Every structure is written in structure tokens, then in C-alpha cells.
């Protein structure tokens, strides 16, 4: 099953001609999940030909303008594409007020259901039979959340040789075993799925962290992520400035990635003081701590692969 992340915008504070504000879209087959909705999100969705009609849920980190001002336009646009499914908007306190006020002031025409969920306590905020999204507190100048999208374990691989050895003929009985059901073999014995299936296999994990001072505890929340998107707003040596503004340097983000043993980290939410050519400084500093670091770029996409 395909799982990929699209960087819709990688900038922080203000948009630049070549850099939209922070927004990341995760696509799992036909389902879309948006993490933050900065200014320029609609433009990026159009350029990437992504079907915003299929966005299931939008997860907002906090209500600073550079993370949420793209939301009203996206809500209005969704009324123009015959959306039928409800849209979930999930975030910390003030998200519901922002959505409701925007609808009133802009006199929005909305022809689909919007379900807003404000997070009061960290934990699971969205789930299906195959995956869940968890939230956890960050430390910024207003209530701010990080998120992890994690698939549940998959069944182990089916062992046809084991099935044959247990006198289970090829056909519908094999399918039942793979579906988690017991069957009766040709010689009348009860065969359990675990008799012919290998160990369960790990699902994939995506984590999104932006706008927070350095917290070592973040590493536990994003542990073993396949793809970790994390703010790296400033270069090494600016730790004091970052702490005062409740942001992180690129090396602090890299330390979290290292401690969490993630597979790959993409820096995001760059300070507008850095041009694209100057971002290499952030990359070089981060790679001193965590070599598997890349720079987010607008319209970049990353495939998340299964381990096996």
C-alpha cells in the first residue's frame, strides 16, 4: 500500500516568492491527511495535482498565522468540488473558534459537514482499523501539538509449505488462514493462523513536529519514525535565540532524530533570513549529528517504504 509525504510549504513566519508556509500532506492510497495549512497550501495542492476533495482530516499544530491562514480558502474550495464526506479539523484550543469565526466573517458557503475536535489531552485523536494519529504537547508561545501517523502491525507472511505439511489444501482455506481464521485440515485437525503465519510485521510511521523549543522528550514520541519532519529554524550557535523564541536549531532537531532512531529526517519551517542557497548551512550542521537529514523543499515528495 502506497504511503507518501508531500511538502506543500517549508517556510516559517512569512511566505517568500520561492517558499510557501508550512504544510505537509500525507497520502495513503486514496486518503489524504494534511498537517498544518499555511498560506499557499491551495497553490501547492494545485501544482502537485493533489485532490483536496479527498482530504480526510487536517491536523493543526497551533493557531499562529503561518500555520493556519490557508485553512479558510481550503474550506471554501471544498464546497466547489461536490464533497460528500465530513472533513475533520483537529488541533489545540482556539482551532474551533478560528474555524467558526472564519465561516461567519467570510459568510462561507459550506455544503458538507465540518467536524472540529479540540485537543485537551494528548493521545489518539484519529483512528481507523489500519492506523492511528496521536498528538503530544510541544512547548511554544501558545498551545502547540506534534503528531505521529502510525500504521498498526500487519499480519506475518503466509507459509505455504507449513500449510501443506499440516494437510491444508491450497484454495479457500489458505485465504481464511491469512484472514485470521481457524480452519480444519484434511485429516480433521484444527489449524490456527499462527501455525502457518510468520511474525507480525511493523507498519510505517510519520511524525510532524514544528514550533517548539528543544524538548528531549520529543524523541520518545517520534521513536522509530520512517520519516520525521521537524522544524530546524536556525543554524548551530543560535540556541539562545531559538530558546527565547521557543523554536529549535537544526542541530537540536538532529539530536531528536538521532535519539529517536528515525530513518530519515527532513528539516522544515526555516527562518526567512535564509535564502535557499543559504539553507545548506542548516543541512551541514544537522548532518554532523544525524547524517540521514534532508532539506524540505516546496513540492518535494517522499515515499515511506515497508521494512520488508
UniProtKB/Swiss-Prot annotation:
Disulfide bond sites: none
Active-site residues, record numbering mapped to chain: 66 (proton acceptor)
Keywords: Endonuclease, Hydrolase, Metal-binding, Nuclease, tRNA processing, Zinc
UniProt-annotated binding residues for Zn(2+) 1: 62, 64, 140, 211
Keyword tRNA processing listed: yes
Any one Gene Ontology molecular-function term assigned to this protein's record: 3'-tRNA processing endoribonuclease activity
Record-linked Pfam families: Lactamase_B, Lactamase_B_2
Transmembrane helix among keywords: no
Cofactor: Zn(2+)
Cofactor details (free text): Binds 2 Zn(2+) ions.
Residues annotated for Zn(2+) 2 binding in this entry: 66-67, 211, 269
Enzyme class: hydrolase
EC number(s) from the headed UniProt entry: 3.1.26.11
SUPFAM superfamilies: Metallo-hydrolase/oxidoreductase
Recorded catalytic activity of this chain's protein: Endonucleolytic cleavage of RNA, removing extra 3' nucleotides from tRNA precursor, generating 3' termini of tRNAs. A 3'-hydroxy group is left at the tRNA terminus and a 5'-phosphoryl group is left at the trailer molecule
Record text on subunit structure and interactions: Homodimer.
HAMAP family: RNase_Z_BN (MF_01818)
Family classification: Belongs to the RNase Z family.
PANTHER family: ZINC PHOSPHODIESTERASE ELAC PROTEIN 1
Biological role stated in the UniProt entry: Zinc phosphodiesterase, which displays some tRNA 3'-processing endonuclease activity. Probably involved in tRNA maturation, by removing a 3'-trailer from precursor tRNA.
Name listed for the protein in its UniProt record: Ribonuclease Z
Primary gene name: rnz
